[in-house]
Amino acid sequence: MEQVFKTELNGKEFSLRAGKIAKQASGSVIVQYGETIVLVTAVAAKEARDSVSFLPLTVEYQEKIYAAGRIPGNYFRREIGRPSEKETLTARLIDRPIRPLFEKGWASEIQVIATVISTDKENDPDVLALVGASAALQMSDIPFAGPIAGLRVGRIDGKFIANPTVQEMENSDIELVVAGSKTGVVMVEGGADVVSEADMLEAIFFGHQAMQPLIQLQEDLKKALGKEKRAYTPPLVDEELMAKVVELAQDKIHTAVQTQGKFERVKALDDVRTEVIETLGEAFADRINEIKSMFGDLVKKVSRKIVLTENQRIDGRAFDEVREITCEVGVLPRPHGSALFTRGETQVLGVLTLGSGPDEQRIETLNGNETRNFMLHYNFPPFSVGECRRAGGPSRRDVGHGNLAHRALARVLPDQADFEYTIRLVGEVMESNGSSSMGTVCAGTLALMDGGVPIAAPVSGIAMGLVSDADNTVVLTDILGDEDHFGDMDFKVAGTEQGITALQMDIKIRELPKAVLVKALDQARIGRLHILKRMLATLEIHRDKMSPYAPKIITVKINPDKIREIIGPGGKMIRSIQADTNTNIEVDDSGLIKIAAENQEDGEAAAKIVSDIGMDPEIGGIYEGEVVKTTDFGAFVRIKTGTDGLVHISELANHRVKKVTDVVKEGEVIRVKVLEITRDGKIRLSCKALEEEEK
C-alpha cells in the first residue's frame, strides 16, 4: 500500500512516496518536486565481507533520457557506457554526506541507486536524489544515523531562494548545495560570483534552516513504514592485544609521525609497524591483519593527541601556517600558457590550450544538447604519490576535483563575446601531499595569466582541516594528506582577493557546529590571500600578448542573406575556403562569421574571401578584381567570389580601344568602378571612369 508524505518548499509541493514500487529493495522511495521524479533504492548484502578496512558503500546516480521525453542520440539509442560527468558528480554529492552516518566497522556491502525517471527541466534532480538516498536508508533495515536532507541555495537580487529553478539559477550570484541534519551542517558544495565569507555563511545557514521540513518528512516516513534495523555489534577490540600494541608502539609512533617529510614520515612509521609485527607475529600469527588495523588506529589517535593536547602539528607548523610556496610561469614552450605551482610537497603543472568554436565540448544532457567553451581536466597519476599502479582514465575523484577547480575559475573568465576562444585547462598533479585540487586552482590561474587570458581577477585556493573532541576544537590551515586522513574535516575554499568563487566541505563527524564553520572560513580567507600574494609576486597581471602558437580568431559581419553563398551547395564553398586558407570557419545565423587560423596571414586571407562573398557591390564602389574572360565587346572581371561584372570595350580606357586584349588579359588583376547594377543583377564596370576620377 503506497503512502505519500508531503510538504511545501519554495511554494511547490515536495513529496516522498513509498510502498508501491521496488518493494524488494531494503528501502525504496520516490521523490517528486514539480514534475521531476527520482526513484532511490537502498540495499545491503546479507553477509559481511572479510577483512574490510573501509565502508563498502557504492552510490550510483542514473539519468534516463526518457525522463525528458527524448530518445538517446547515440547509435544504440539507449543509455550506454560510462556515467556522464553530471552523473558522476551527483553520485559523489550523495555519497559524501551519507558515508559518515553508517556504523563504524560495518562490513556488509551497501548499494544506493538513484534513477531519474521524469524531469520537467526546471527542478534539478540531484538534490532530490540526495534527499531520497537518506529517506530510503531511513526506512530500510540498514543501521543509519540519519535523516539528513539537501537542497540548493540561490540568491537573486539579494534574496535567498531554496531550490530555485534551473532558469532562476541563471540570475543567481550563488549556487550552493547544502546537506545537513536536524542540528547541523554535514556537507557544502558550490560556487559564487565572488561573494564575501559573511554572505556565504548566511547562504549555508539559510539552506540548513530551509531543509528542516524535508528532515521531518523523512521522520514521518520512517515512523510509518520504517523496517526494524538489523542487529549490529561493532567488532570487539581485543583489549589485551591492543595494550601490547600500545606498549610496543605508542612512544615510537609519537616520534615517527613528527618526522619531517612525507616519505621520511612514512618510512619511520613503517619501521615501527614492522617491529611491532615481528615482535607479536609469532604469538599472534593468525591475527596479523588485526594488529595492522590496531596500529593504524593508534597512529590516528597519537596524531590527533599531538594536535589537541600538545598544540602542535605533525610537521611543526603553526595551526594557521601555509607551507612554502614557489611559482613558475611559461614553463612549456608550445602550449598557449603554463605554470608550475608548488606548495610544500604538493605540486601541480597547469597547462592552457586555446581553441575555436568547433573545439567546444558537446554534451547530451536531460535538458538537451549543451556546449561548454571552458573545460578543466584534473589528472592524478600514480607517480604523484610514489605508487606503482594502473594509470587508467579519470576516476570519480578526478572528475570531482576537476569540477571544483572549474567552479573556482569559471567565475572570473571573460565573457565569450569579449574573448571568443574555447579554453581548456589541464591540472597535472606532479606531487601530492594534501589539497591538489586547490593546487590546480592556483596553477590554473597562473597558466591563464601566462596565456594572456584577460581574467577578471586571479584566484587562489586552500584546504582547511579540523581535529576535535569533546573538549577541544582545532582548525588547521593548508592540511597535509596525513592531516586529512586523521582529521575530521576537509574544507576547500577558493576565491579572489574580494571574495569566494568556490567551496567544498566534507566531514567525518556527524555534524559541524556553526562556530567552527565561521572560524574555518575566516582562517581560510587569511590563508588563501597569503597564497595569492605569492602567486602575484610571480605574475601580477595577465600578459598583454597571447602565445604566438595560439590560434588567431577573426570575425567578419555579413548580410545574413549571403550565408547561403558562404556555405555553397552542400557546403562546397565553405569547405573550399577552409582548405585553401588552412582555417576553420563558423557561420552564425546572424551573419557573424568566426575564422580561426594558425597564423594571422591565413586568417586574413579567409576573411577577405568571406568579406568578398558577403558584401553587396555598390554603385560607385571601387573594387580590385581578376579578369576572368575577354570577348570582342569587353572583359568580365570578378570583383568578388561568385560575382562578375562587365567592362565594355568602350569603358576599358579613356582612349579608343581597338582590341580588348590590347588593354587587359585574362588572369590580370585590375581596378574597376561600378557604374550600374541592373534589375536582373548584371553589373556594369568601368576602368575609364576610374582613370578620369584619379586625374
From Swiss-Prot:
Residues 551-610 form the KH domain. It is found in: Cytoplasm. Pfam families: KH_1, PNPase, RNase_PH, RNase_PH_C, S1. The gene is pnp. Keywords: Cytoplasm, Magnesium, Metal-binding, Nucleotidyltransferase, RNA-binding, Transferase. Its EC number is 2.7.7.8. It catalyses: RNA(n+1) + phosphate = RNA(n) + a ribonucleoside 5'-diphosphate. This is Polyribonucleotide nucleotidyltransferase. The keyword Transcription does not apply. Mg(2+) binds at residues 484, 490. SMART domains: KH, S1. Belongs to the polyribonucleotide nucleotidyltransferase family. Its main location: cytoplasm. SUPFAM superfamilies: Eukaryotic type KH-domain (KH-domain type I), Nucleic acid-binding proteins, Ribonuclease PH domain 2-like, Ribosomal protein S5 domain 2-like. PROSITE patterns: KH_TYPE_1 (PS50084), S1 (PS50126). GO terms for molecular function: 3'-5'-RNA exonuclease activity; magnesium ion binding; polyribonucleotide nucleotidyltransferase activity; RNA binding. The lineage of its organism: Bacteria, Pseudomonadati, Thermodesulfobacteriota, Desulfobacteria, Desulfobacterales.
